C-alpha cells in the first residue's frame, strides 16, 4: 500500500507544481531589430533588443549591437491585452549603468506591448534606446516561449 501512496503523492505533487508554474500568456522571448542607419562605409548599423518574460519578476531587456551592450532587469505586468514593462535595475543590481549614469528610476515605465489585430504594437515610454516617448510601432515580435 505504501508504494501506491508514494506514487500518488508524487503524481499530485508534480501536478500541483505544474499548475503553480504554468506559463502566462505573455511569457516568452520578444525581439526588436532596431535599424540605426548606415555607418561609415555604408554598412547598416543595428541594435537587437531582446525582451525575456517569465512571470512578473522574470523580466530582462538585453540590448546588443552597434555601440550598445546593456542588460536591464525589469518588471512585466500583464494588463488585459497589454504588457507593461517597467525598470527595476541594471543587471548589476544598481540603478546606474556600467558607466555610472542613472538613465531610469525604479518603477519607471519603459514601454508597453499591446495585442492588436495585425500583431504586437510597442508604445515607447522611457526606454532610451528607442524612438521618442509616446511613439508606437510594430517593434517587438514574439519569437519563442
What are these regions (language model features)?
Residues 41-78, 122-128:
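N-terminal glycine/threonine-rich, aromatic-flanked beta-hairpin/loop signature
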Residues 7-15:
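Bacterial N-terminal signal peptides
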Residues 23-44, 122-128, 136, 140-144:
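Tryptophan-anchored aromatic micro-motifs
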Residues 68-84, 116-145:
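Edge beta-strand at a domain terminus
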Amino acid at each position: 500500500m505504501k508504494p501506491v501512496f508514494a506514487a500518488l503523492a508524487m503524481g499530485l505533487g508534480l501536478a500541483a507544481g505544474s499548475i503553480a508554474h504554468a506559463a502566462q500568456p505573455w511569457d516568452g522571448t520578444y525581439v526588436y531589430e532596431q535599424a540605426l542607419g548606415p555607418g561609415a562605409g555604408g554598412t547598416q548599423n543595428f541594435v537587437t533588443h531582446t525582451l525575456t518574460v517569465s512571470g512578473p519578476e522574470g523580466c530582462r531587456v538585453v540590448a546588443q549591437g552597434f555601440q550598445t551592450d546593456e542588460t536591464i532587469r525589469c518588471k512585466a505586468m500583464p494588463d488585459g491585452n497589454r504588457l507593461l514593462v517597467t525598470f527595476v535595475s541594471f543587471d548589476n543590481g544598481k540603478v546606474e549603468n556600467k558607466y555610472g549614469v542613472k538613465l531610469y528610476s525604479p518603477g519607471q515605465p519603459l514601454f508597453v506591448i499591446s495585442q492588436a489585430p495585425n500583431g504586437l504594437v510597442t508604445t515607447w515610454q522611457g526606454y532610451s534606446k528607442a524612438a521618442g516617448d509616446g511613439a508606437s510601432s510594430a517593434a517587438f515580435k514574439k519569437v519563442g516561449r
